Amino acid sequence: MDSFGRAPPLWPQSALPRVPGAAPSSSGLPWSRVGEIAIFTFVAVLALYLLWSWVGRDLLLVLKARRGGTTEELTFGPRERHSLPAVAVARVENPPCPSGSVEARPFTG
């Protein structure tokens, strides 16, 4: 009775399910890390776009207006600006009012 205290196995060892001790290691980046990088890149591009559309354009308009340029039409790049000739504004004299010949009566009609 050499095997005192040891019971014989009920099933053979090959029939038992094998449970791995640890998950196999992958050689590249895990998919969760790739997803994090993709989401971070998307959020960063969206943030830069919103920053430009909300803040950057308005800041450019303010700086252009402070330099004395027009904010109606911005030109980018090396374009030649043609200045418009100065138009002389003639002062128009108001015609004189009729002198007392017309009697003003409001709300009559």
From Swiss-Prot:
Its main location: host cell. Keywords: Host membrane, Membrane, Transmembrane, Transmembrane helix, Transport, Viral movement protein. Residues 1-28 are annotated as: Disordered. It is found in: Host membrane. It is a single-pass membrane protein. It comes from the Viruses. The keyword Membrane applies. One of its GO terms (biological process) is transport of virus in host, cell to cell. Involved in the viral transport within, and between cells. Belongs to the mastrevirus movement protein family. This is Movement protein. The lineage of its organism: Viruses, Monodnaviria, Shotokuvirae, Cressdnaviricota, Repensiviricetes.
